[in-house]
Amino acid sequence: MEESSRILVVGGTGYIGRRIVKASIALGHPTFILFRKEVVSDVEKVEMLLSFKKNGAKLLEASFDDHESLVDAVKQVDVVISAVAGNHMRHHILQQLKLVEAIKEAGNIKRFVPSEFGMDPGLMDHAMAPGNIVFIDKIKVREAIEAAAIPHTYISANIFAGYLVGGLAQLGRVMPPSDKVFLYGDGNVKAVWIDEEDVGIYTIKAIDDPRTLNKTVYIRPPLNVLSQKEVVEKWEKLSRKSLDKIYMSVEDFLAGMEGQSYGEKIGISHFYQMFYKGDLYNFEIGPNGVEASQLYPGVKYTTVDSYMERYL
């Protein structure tokens, strides 16, 4: 029986990284977590690392500013998964260029998964500013990976449920509104809503699969392909409460960017791409992509209906 690939997770204490670590351990992979010495100032992250260590993970100290430490860490594994923070923290995404250089020098990595996990940056050249900068930077990382001929898989995980399902996709809310809900446009644009735990499972499933080599894996479980209005209706049915619906035109929505911080403007522009332009589901998956729930039908993914029950 072939041994399971050894996996190094970079950003393993982050929002999605911790789910990837958990899935890697659960699926029987020797799991390594990269950590920086500065982590000692964050007690919660230290506790998380120690919890993962107790469950079998190995901790490797390294730094993006120490090339040799990165190379040494990479040489101990077969697969590298980066889950460094993105969005408005631009320098984190571009720091992956240092990781690419380490992987290139080590020469032993069978698969690299860079930090993406949202909309496919390869399809977002039309994105509006300032949200487009996230996709531009992720493309720079892709270009470096491909120029170095590093075997890779890109993961497009769409909407993280923890951010938007509970709040019914209301800006700044993570819990269900009690009286009214804003619908973007007519509320009928399709999106894809994914439990973060499932992102971890599908990511780990993909790293040894020849069908995902040098391809983009789109996580599109069919029961979770829903419009915002459909998500709202599911909550109303589950909670047995009707909400007043306020339909927001694209002009009114974009006017809300004025006076916001840079990070908030990025978030608003991404909402525009998802709920007005439909950029999560307005395209067919091409020959360079595959769909996760079709590849792994045995994974029992969490439906939006099931996910919502925690908010009752």
Curated annotation (Swiss-Prot):
CDD domains attached to this UniProt entry: PCBER_SDR_a (cd05259)
GO biological process: lignan biosynthetic process
Active site per database record: 138 (proton acceptor)
GO function terms (MF aspect): lariciresinol reductase activity; pinoresinol reductase activity
Keyword Oxidoreductase listed: yes
Chain sites annotated for binding NADP(+): 11-17, 36, 45, 142
Catalyses which reaction(s): (+)-lariciresinol + NADP(+) = (+)-pinoresinol + NADPH + H(+); (-)-secoisolariciresinol + NADP(+) = (+)-lariciresinol + NADPH + H(+)
UniProt-listed Enzyme Commission number(s): 1.23.1.2, 1.23.1.1
InterPro entries in UniProt: NAD(P)-bd_dom_sf, NmrA-like, NmrA-type/Isoflavone_red_sf, PCBER-like
Keywords per UniProt: NADP, Oxidoreductase
Function: Reductase involved in lignan biosynthesis. Catalyzes the enantioselective sequential conversion of (+)-pinoresinol into (+)-lariciresinol and of (+)-lariciresinol into (-)-secoisolariciresinol. Abstracts the 4R-hydride from the NADPH cofactor during catalysis.
Family per record: Belongs to the NmrA-type oxidoreductase family. Isoflavone reductase subfamily.
Protein name per the record: Bifunctional pinoresinol-lariciresinol reductase
UniProt source species: Thuja plicata
